[in-house]
């Protein structure tokens, strides 16, 4: 029944998704304003969702142009469906323009197809189809749309300051069948304090170093600019050997007497950096072999001492595991250095229930002072958990099982979704077990089958939660 309903809307679903994907909704603080708090792209994507909602007869409510909602249904209780329309930067290496959607016979290719524009449109159409069926709603629905999920969650922070908290809800921002627990997440900077000037003339001076754009992505590119005072050829040969030994791609060029070294890695989501290749940490590992100036030597030595090959926090003294949520993970997403202001490591740390975060951070902060570094802590989101046997969770899982015959149990993840904003919130799709996960990677795509099947599952789930008694 539900899949047949969705079939009637397939062309509309694709067309509306294409329109949303064509918006480059990457956060841009340089162009932020009161009318576009995280930049014009995210604001445009939010307005686009309002436009299709108004076209279809829904009421919307805007919250300071950084978040908002589409409203449906009636009743005392509220089902929240928490989506986001911002995306991470496209990065390099795409086979097509990431913001000009390519529709093939089987798939749609563009940045945001999986995370989270495709699932957002799927959830929207589930609501629209039920509305078109003139169902007798028993709950209200607030489809909450954010514009800063990929960075600081300013959108939901602002939204929930003034807006009604849903009774329960789900975020279509992960995987089926249902994710009922999420690790704690924090971002923080490890900031180098400027050291004394060099007493002796160093052989090499690190001018600048840059790797990474987002704390929650493994950097796939790194660049160092080094003033080489002698033996330039030897350094280049050593670098080429280093790349070969570590099975890396990279390059070396000379620009106005400055040696420019680059390393290419593999970008993946920061919730499991062990499956990526951190270009920045590898390039710092090579630089440690050079007789650098004092500041730079301290910077690269710190990286090797605490960060390189420490995806689970081992070198930081934070290794920890639970059976429910798994391991602490540690992603070094941003690395910067310049010879005027010293360096910074931007960290995305994720931790399971039971990890004594504050105690671990205090101990680490005290330890690294001796090496000229300090911790500047950002936002801390504690672990989030809903019992998988809760009737709400079971209704979602039943809808999934009815349409897939897959009896996989709900589980927990290291990623963070909007679900943690709710007392009774979970992540529900839209990826399936056979979906290729290219979130935050080049050539991101969603298959038409996945898009339509997710819409059908959301349709049944929302019906069971908001229409059936």
Curated annotation (Swiss-Prot):
Domain of life: Bacteria
Binding-site residues for Zn(2+) 2, renumbered to this chain: 84, 115, 173
Cofactor note: Binds 2 Zn(2+) ions per subunit.
List of residues binding Zn(2+) 1: 115, 150, 440
GO biological process terms on file: L-arginine biosynthetic process; proteolysis
Annotated keywords: Dipeptidase, Hydrolase, Metal-binding, Metalloprotease, Protease, Zinc
CDD domains: M20_PepV
InterPro entries: Bact_exopeptidase_dim_dom, M20A_pepV-rel, Peptidase_M20, Peptidase_M20A
Catalytic center residues: 86, 149
GO molecular function per UniProt: acetylornithine deacetylase activity; dipeptidase activity; metallopeptidase activity; zinc ion binding
Cofactor(s) the protein needs: Zn(2+)
EC number: 3.4.13.-
Enzyme class, first EC level, given as a word: hydrolase
Family classification: Belongs to the peptidase M20A family.
Stated name of the protein: Putative dipeptidase SAS1677
Species for this entry: Staphylococcus aureus (strain MSSA476)
Lineage: Bacteria, Bacillati, Bacillota, Bacilli, Bacillales
């Amino acid at each position: 029944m539900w899949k047949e309903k969705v079939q009637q809307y397939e062309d509309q679903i694709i067309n509306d998704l294409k329109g949303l994907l064509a918006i480059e909704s990457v956060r841009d603080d340089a162009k932020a304003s009161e009318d576009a708090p995280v930049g014009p792209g995210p604001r445009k994507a939010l307005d686009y969702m309002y436009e299709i909602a108004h076209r279809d007869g829904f009421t919307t409510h805007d919250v300071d142009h950084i978040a908002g909602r589409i409203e449906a249904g009636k009743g005392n209780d509220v089902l929240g469906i928490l989506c986001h329309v911002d995306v991470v930067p496209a990065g390099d290496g795409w086979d097509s323009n990431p913001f000009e959607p390519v529709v093939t016979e089987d798939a749609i290719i563009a940045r945001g197809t999986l995370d989270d524009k495709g699932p957002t449109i799927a959830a929207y159409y589930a609501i629209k189809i039920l509305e078109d069926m003139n169902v007798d709603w028993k709950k209200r629905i607030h489809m909450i749309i954010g514009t800063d999920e990929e960075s600081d969650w300013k959108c939901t922070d602002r939204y929930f300051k003034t807006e009604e908290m849903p009774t329960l809800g789900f975020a279509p921002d992960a995987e089926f069948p249902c994710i009922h627990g999420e690790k704690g997440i924090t971002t923080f900077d490890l900031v180098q304090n400027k050291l004394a000037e060099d007493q002796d003339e160093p052989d090499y001076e690190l001018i600048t170093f840059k790797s990474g754009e987002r704390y929650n992505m493994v950097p796939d590119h790194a660049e160092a600019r080094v003033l080489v005072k002698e033996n330039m050829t030897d350094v280049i040969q050593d670098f080429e050997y280093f790349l070969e030994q570590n099975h890396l791609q990279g390059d070396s060029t000379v620009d106005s007497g400055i040696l420019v070294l680059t390393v290419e890695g593999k970008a993946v989501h920061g919730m499991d950096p062990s499956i990526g290749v951190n270009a920045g940490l590898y390039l710092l590992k090579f630089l440690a072999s050079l007789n650098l100036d004092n500041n730079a030597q301290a910077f690269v030595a710190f990286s090797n001492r605490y960060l390189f090959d420490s995806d689970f926090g081992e070198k930081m003294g934070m290794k920890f595991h639970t059976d429910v949520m798994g391991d602490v993970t540690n992603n070094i997403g941003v690395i910067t250095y310049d010879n005027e202001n010293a360096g910074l490591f931007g960290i995305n740390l994720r931790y399971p229930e039971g990890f004594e975060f504050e105690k671990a951070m205090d101990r680490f902060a005290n330890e690294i002072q001796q090496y000229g570094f300090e911790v500047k802590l950002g936002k801390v989101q504690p672990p989030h958990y809903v019992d998988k046997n809760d009737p709400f969770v079971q209704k979602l899982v039943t809808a999934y099982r009815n349409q897939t015959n897959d009896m996989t149990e709900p589980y927990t993840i290291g990623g963070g979704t909007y679900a943690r904003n709710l007392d009774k919130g979970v992540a529900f799709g839209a990826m399936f077990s056979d979906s290729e996960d290219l979130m935050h990677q080049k050539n991101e795509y969603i298959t038409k089958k996945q898009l339509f099947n997710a819409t059908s599952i959301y349709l049944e789930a929302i019906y069971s939660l908001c229409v059936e008694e």
